[in-house]
Amino acid sequence: MLTVREVSLTRETLEEIRKIDLEFYPNIGLIHWYLSRYKPWHSAFVALDDGKMIGYFVAVPVRKELYDAVLNGVMVDDLGINPDMYLQESEYYYAVSIVIQEAYRGRNISRQLLDAYFSKYPDKKTCLLAVSKGGHHLAEHYFSLVKDLSENVAVFASRSTVNP
């Protein structure tokens, strides 16, 4: 049975996220990369199939400077974000990643994760970089397009931010 819930980004959760990421991002190998950025007070919305994590969505509070850099197209590679840009609390959020295991795609799981996020945090100023056509298509349902940076990369922001 598929369930979606919010969980803290503990080491255990980050190790599960890393396993999913390795399917798509083989260059992110070390758990220390995750631990340097995410803290237990950060959270993820995870999709579980009979208790096994099969997908996740992470959006974390960030400094306004990072939020603005994303919106302006200055920051387009989140691997290089200084971990000091992530905060414990902020009105600005950066949607770091949404990943669903290949075998579970096409079941609207990404939408369930984003529905859960926006149900809990309807007023957060959230930005993201869509780096694939699938990501772009998904983002269009929940965010407003700020700008296309290239054929595959686009900046989106929560609708309340772009169209107050």
Map each language-model feature to its residues.
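Short amphipathic alpha-helix that is part of the acyltransferase structural core
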Residues: 1-35, 39-54, 58-63
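Conserved acyl-donor/pantetheine-binding loop and adjacent beta-alpha core of acyl/acetyltransferases
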Residues: 58-97
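Conserved beta-strand-loop-alpha-helix junction that forms the acyl-donor binding cleft
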Residues: 98-105, 127-155
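Conserved beta strand-loop-helix elements of the APE1-like EEP
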Residues: 156-161
